[in-house]
Amino acid sequence: MASCCENSCAVDALHGKQRSTLIKVLWINAIMFIAILAAAFYGKSTALLSDSLDNLGDALTYGLSLYAVTRGPTIKARVALFKGVLIFIAASLVIVQIIHRLVNPVLPSYEVMSIFSIAGLVANGICLFLLWRHRNEDINMSSVFECSRNDIASNLSVILAAIGVWVFNSGIPDIIIATLLAAILLRSAARVIKGALSELA
């Protein structure tokens, strides 16, 4: 009986730590989504737009993960599957914007891109640090960690895009990086969906 109680307390403690971490990273991503989305439209950057949609997807993902923390493996797998679908939708929106920019080219602001991609990198670095200890605990937390890791790559890519826009005085580097980010999102969506489906099988 004591052993059962200890196990139950340990599980409750783990869920409490997961919930606390998810609340923190949810707020960070929600704030960064609003800031980077505004910057993307102001700076006319498709790469920044993809970055902001990534933050929105993560904020929604963390909200869903909060729901799944105390649920069983099947519910967690279903939530992970939904996360994968959200990532896929974000990638699709980026692809639509890329096509729009190819048809209607503009020169993005490399200053805006640089400032907000660096701010995003710092914010997502904090999120990754907070999520690191939870990355192998279950399918729910591993899929959350996957999202956060993608954000770091996304921010670094936008910084490279900003440098490219500055050096070449062209919007093409922005489109190239946005395309790469869309590919990363699609790959991540496939990985999360595959993992969730294997859990549900």
Q: Across the structure, where does each feature detected by a protein language model lie?
A:
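Alpha-helical transmembrane cores and adjacent cytosolic helix/loop segments
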Residues: 1-201
